[in-house]
């Protein structure tokens, strides 16, 4: 019986947004079709990201599936796939709410992998731990690309050496994206410094920050300019509001530099011509572009698709080697109602220094 091929059920359960713009558990959702170059996954755990909570209104495709981060068990393998077998464990990201593939989202009982934005879960890593990584890996890689910084080399024993310290300011250093980015920066030979609340200082330092500052401290921009000898050139804003943008611009050294945020930033706060600006857009990691409303809409790009493939090949190796750690977890057991409740916790900002993961119970 174990040798019989997997046949998807006629229906599955998924989390979606209905015609009334309400997040709803859909018990009669369709199952996706398996492409030849992908694998079919029974979802075992999912992580909830702030972006998941924003898929409403113009960002929602009614009855498309929600969810980016998943980890699960391979139940079927496409005919062109040779390196994965049924029973293997994988983790990856989905392009949620995509109108071209409405039945592919992480918040479902079954999904199929997408592009090359997935990897095999190494031994010793649980489904819950693996599910916490995909969005962080993808966003960290995109941020480094936009800052003009190279990705780590998975084969290097030591990070590359620079003639003098090259600092990167990470504003919001206790966020899930920040903790992955700081590790990757360290592995690329850069020195992260971070801002966050004092109760998360140890977390930021454990993920690579050389120094951590209380974001509420007076005259902090000047403190950082002094710490970096007025030579700070790179700033990643993981919060993205008027205060964070203004602060990052003030902390960058006299010669200017590069500012990247995780969302469109308030342009009136970007006050220095010597500082270049950009912001990350998650779906670009697939090379598929985005159909979201302006300013998020973007055409597909083969260059971005190739970058996503390269990033995930590197990051997958780093995770396997134990050199890239996940964010601290808050794990809850349950089903799709628990995912829905978790989205509300994340939307309200009720977590600090933790990634919310739901371990899905069996049918």
Curated annotation (Swiss-Prot):
Q: Specify whether ATP-binding is a keyword of the entry.
A: no
User: Which of this chain's residues are annotated to bind NADP(+)?
Assistant: 51-54, 174-177, 197-200, 215, 262-263, 280, 351-352
Deletion phenotype, per the entry, is: Loss of lovastatin biosynthesis.
- List the GO molecular function terms: lovastatin nonaketide synthase activity; nucleotide binding; oxidoreductase activity, acting on NAD(P)H
Q: Where is this region: LovB-binding?
A: 226-272
Listed under catalytic activity are: holo-[lovastatin nonaketide synthase] + 9 malonyl-CoA + S-adenosyl-L-methionine + 11 NADPH + 19 H(+) = dihydromonacolin L-[lovastatin nonaketide synthase] + S-adenosyl-L-homocysteine + 9 CO2 + 11 NADP(+) + 9 CoA + 6 H2O
Q: Which UniProt keywords apply?
A: NADP, Nucleotide-binding, Oxidoreductase, Transferase
Fetch the Gene3D superfamilies from UniProt.
Medium-chain alcohol dehydrogenases, catalytic domain, NAD(P)-binding Rossmann-like Domain
Q: How is it used?
A: Lovastatin acts as a hypolipidemic agent that works as inhibitor of (3S)-hydroxymethylglutaryl-coenzyme A (HMG-CoA) reductase (HMGR) which reduces HMG-CoA to mevalonate and is the key step in cholesterol biosynthesis. Lovastatin, simvastatin and related compounds are widely used to treat hypercholesteremia and reduce the risk of cardiovascular disease. Furthermore, statins such as lovastatin were found to be anticancer agents.
- Respond yes or no to whether keyword Oxidoreductase is given for this record: yes
Q: What class of enzyme is it?
A: transferase
Q: Name one GO biological process term.
A: lovastatin biosynthetic process
> What InterPro entries does UniProt report for this protein, alphabetically?
ADH-like_N, GroES-like_sf, NAD(P)-bd_dom_sf, PKS_ER, Trans-enoyl_RdTase-like
The pathway to which it is assigned is: Polyketide biosynthesis; lovastatin biosynthesis
Superkingdom of this entry's organism?
Eukaryota
E.C. designation(s):
2.3.1.161
Name the SMART domains on file: PKS_ER
Function statement: Trans-enoyl reductase; part of the gene cluster that mediates the biosynthesis of lovastatin (also known as mevinolin, mevacor or monacolin K), a hypolipidemic inhibitor of (3S)-hydroxymethylglutaryl-coenzyme A (HMG-CoA) reductase (HMGR). The first step in the biosynthesis of lovastatin is the production of dihydromonacolin L acid by the lovastatin nonaketide synthase lovB and the trans-acting enoyl reductase lovC (called the lovB-lovC megasynthase complex) via condensation of one acetyl-CoA unit and 8 malonyl-CoA units. Dihydromonacolin L acid is released from lovB by the thioesterase lovG.
The UniProt similarity line reads: Belongs to the zinc-containing alcohol dehydrogenase family.
Q: How does it assemble?
A: Each MAT domain from the lovB homodimer binds one lovC molecule to form the final active lovB-lovC megasynthase complex.
Q: Return the protein name.
A: Lovastatin nonaketide synthase, enoyl reductase component lovC
Organism, by scientific name, is Aspergillus terreus (strain NIH 2624 / FGSC A1156)
């Amino acid at each position: 019986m174990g040798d019989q091929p997997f046949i998807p059920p006629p229906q599955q359960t998924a989390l979606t947004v209905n015609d009334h713009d309400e997040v709803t558990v859909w018990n009669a959702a369709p199952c996706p079709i398996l492409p030849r170059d992908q694998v079919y996954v029974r979802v075992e755990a999912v992580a909830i990201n702030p972006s998941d909570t924003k898929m409403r209104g113009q960002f929602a495709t009614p009855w498309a599936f929600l969810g980016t981060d998943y980890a699960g068990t391979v139940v079927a393998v496409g005919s062109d796939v040779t390196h994965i077998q049924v029973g293997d464990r994988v983790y990856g990201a989905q392009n949620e709410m995509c109108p071209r593939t409405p039945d592919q989202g992480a918040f479902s009982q079954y999904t199929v992998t997408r592009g090359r934005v997935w990897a095999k879960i190494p031994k010793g890593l649980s489904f819950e731990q693996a599910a916490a990584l995909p969005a962080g890996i993808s966003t960290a890689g995109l941020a480094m690309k936009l800052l003009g910084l190279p990705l780590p080399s998975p084969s290097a024993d030591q990070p590359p050496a620079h003639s003098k310290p090259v600092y990167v300011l990470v504003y919001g250093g206790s966020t899930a994206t920040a903790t992955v980015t700081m590790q990757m920066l360290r592995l690329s030979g850069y020195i992260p410094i971070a801002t966050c609340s004092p109760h998360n200082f140890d977390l930021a330092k454990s993920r690579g920050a050389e120094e951590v500052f209380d974001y509420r401290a007076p005259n902090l921009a000047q403190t950082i300019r002094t710490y970096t000898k007025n030579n700070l050139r790179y700033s990643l804003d993981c919060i993205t509001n008027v205060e964070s943008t203004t602060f990052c611009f003030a902390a960058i050294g006299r010669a200017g530099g590069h500012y990247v945020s995780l969302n469109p930033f308030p342009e009136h706060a970007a006050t220095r011509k010597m500082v270049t600006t950009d912001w990350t857009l998650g779906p670009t990691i697939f090379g598929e572009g985005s159909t979201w409303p302006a300013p998020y809409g973007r055409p597909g790009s083969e260059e971005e698709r190739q970058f996503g493939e390269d990033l995930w090949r590197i990051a997958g190796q780093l995770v396997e080697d134990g050199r890239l750690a996940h964010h601290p977890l808050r794990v809850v057991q349950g089903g799709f109602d628990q995912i829905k409740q978790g989205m509300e916790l994340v939307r309200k900002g009720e977590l600090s220094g933790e990634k919310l993961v739901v371990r899905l119970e069996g049918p």
